[in-house]
Amino acid sequence: MSYWRTKYMNQSNNNAKFAFFYMLSLVALIFMALSAGMIVFQIINKLIKDIIEQYSGSFNSGSLKFAISALIISTPIYYFTARQIYKNLYTGALSKDSGIRKWLTYFILFVSSVVMIGWLIGTINTFLDGDLTLKFALKSLTAVAIAGAVFGFYFYDIKREEIAGKKDMIIKTFFWSSLIIILAIFIGSLFIVESPKETRLRKIDEVVLNRFNSIDNAINMYFADMEKLPKNLDTISDYSNHLSKDELADPETDKKFDYNVLSEKKYELCGDFRTSNLDQEDIRAEYFKERWPHDTGYQCLMQLVNVREGLERLDR
């Protein structure tokens, strides 16, 4: 009685362990496959310029950084759990006819099919919405290649007849080739992603530009009431209830921005910038790039007040 109880408990523990490995490998596989696809998509967006700057077809550094983060975490988890699964299949600890193996493998096939369908729908939708044909073709090939490779591998795996004690070269080839491809995608992403230091400097500049926007709005309101430009920033601060003293200075150095009246409706705001937004291709930076184009260093940005038509940026 004790023998059978022990055997049953060991089998139950193994089933729980293998279910855990399969589910964890599935989650890691989803993140790894999607993040690899996202990185390739962003590389395509970066390298192939489009005069129509659609959000879905434009380079997005935020999406790229998320994909890199997901790839770094999910890749080792997937290969570790997959190795545990196939090692137990090889030793016979996990039977090829196990319900856990069959159900979860077919579930992985189902998920990869859904992902492939979703990716293709998305790429076709962007193509119909005016995306470049070359971009559409490359993204479609990427989606089909990734989802097809996952589907093909697991479909082959579930159909294998001899598993225990037999080393399968197709399984081994898939693991090594997929790992090499993942590493190549990761290395490629490093050439187009900005460093954490560059990101921080750019975000500080964005704070500066947000403060320029606040000052700009206050100047416009002042001009609407007084029909003239304010003499200095202190005048604007005293006039506006929505503009704090902190917004008149650099967020890092606390150095006060310079303000100069150039003509009846023209003025400039000056400050120090850590980066240049003139060559930024990130879709999220388009507003500041159009509204407040600046280079690195001390820059004076000219603006024109127009109460009727709103604020317009002067061509530099």
What is the predicted function of each stretch?
Residues 32-52, 116-127:
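Membrane-helix interface motif
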Residues 165-194:
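Internal/C-terminal transmembrane anchor helices
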Residues 12-30, 96-107:
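Alpha-helical transmembrane segments and their helix-start/interface "positive-inside/aromatic belt" motifs
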Residues 217-278:
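Extracellular/periplasmic head regions of type IV pilus-like filament subunits
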Residues 110-160:
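Membrane-embedded alpha-helical segments of integral membrane proteins
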Residues 62-85, 142-151:
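Generic alpha-helical transmembrane segments
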Residues 9-13, 82-100, 155-169:
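Cytoplasmic membrane-interface regions of multi-pass membrane proteins
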Residues 194-196, 263-316:
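Short, surface-exposed interaction loops/tails
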